[in-house]
């Protein structure tokens, strides 16, 4: 994010190289994600902003249920260390409707969610399709596959990544975050029909 705009990672490389390097460092052990193609026309995974059709409190609660002690939301943590803040933007669908949007089912394990494991280096292209707003429904909870992933991470003593096996809406371009509501993942869900995107300070 630069100013009030959330940029795809690949655009950050030109716009804000220091922030790009900080975000890129989060791909340690899964660097192949940086070159992962998600469409026949060559669109890359990180040519998009990754949004989730799930209230972030569901992610927090799933971790709490398993005793993973997720951190409380804290804006200063991201500002001072670049680490996860627990804060998300609430993004109404009509706010991004003029952009190219893809629906990503996130079913098949690949290096993005399983760093340093023997899994494919790119996701199957058939898990991506043009986004259809008329079919969109917010997920009521994390997927069964995500819950199983969290259990596996706990059993192996590893820190879980945030959105493994959670479907995504991928936005192929920047998102103006001015006037978007910021929500904390440790606050309970309200009834809304929007997407969430991680706040990057």
Segment roles from a protein language model:
Residues 1-49, 56-201:
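Active-site-proximal loop/hinge segments that shape catalytic or ion-binding/gating pockets
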């Amino acid at each position: 994010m630069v100013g009030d705009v959330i940029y795809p990672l690949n655009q950050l490389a030109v716009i804000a190289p220091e922030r790009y390097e900080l975000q890129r460092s989060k791909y340690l052990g899964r660097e192949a994600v940086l070159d992962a193609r998600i469409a026949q026309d060559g669109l890359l995974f990180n040519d998009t902003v990754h949004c989730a059709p799930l209230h972030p409190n569901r992610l927090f609660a799933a971790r709490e249920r398993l005793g993973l002690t997720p951190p409380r939301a804290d804006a200063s943590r991201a500002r001072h260390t670049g680490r996860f803040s627990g804060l998300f933007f609430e993004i109404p669908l009509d706010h991004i409707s003029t952009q190219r949007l893809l629906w990503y089912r996130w079913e098949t394990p690949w290096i993005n969610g399983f760093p340093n494991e023997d899994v494919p280096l790119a996701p199957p292209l058939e898990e991506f399709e043009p986004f259809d707003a008329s079919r969109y429904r917010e997920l009521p909870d994390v997927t069964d596959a995500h819950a199983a992933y969290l259990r596996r991470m706990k059993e192996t003593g590893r820190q879980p990544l945030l959105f493994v096996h959670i479907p995504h809406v991928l936005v192929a371009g920047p998102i103006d975050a001015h006037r978007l509501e910021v929500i904390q993942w440790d606050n309970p869900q309200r009834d809304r029909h929007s997407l969430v995107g991680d706040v990057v300070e």
